[in-house]
Amino acid sequence: MKKKKLYTIYKITNLLNEMIYIGQHVTENLNDSYMGSSKYLKRDIIDFGLQNFKKEILFIFETKEEMIAKEKELVNKEFTKRIDTYNRSLGGGGLYTLGQVSVKD
């Protein structure tokens, strides 16, 4: 039996400097090890150690569209300009689906 996809919005907090990252993630396991896509966040996880970061699931949605809409609402222009966030891009991106691709010989 196939597991149900969970469309989530999460927050990762750096426990040392209180910087945060808000992102979206599609998973079948809320306890997976995914820790965001920000290169700035990834750099700090390497520098400070994973033990100094906390991940919280803020919202779980039934659809991708609901998840994307919530991330757009939370990670807006004002949010990305804050000095306490790793987010540098507006929310709502990141999940792009390509159509069918054919390769001819």
Write out the residue ranges for each language-model feature.
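Structure-specific nucleic-acid interaction/processing domains
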Residues: 1-104
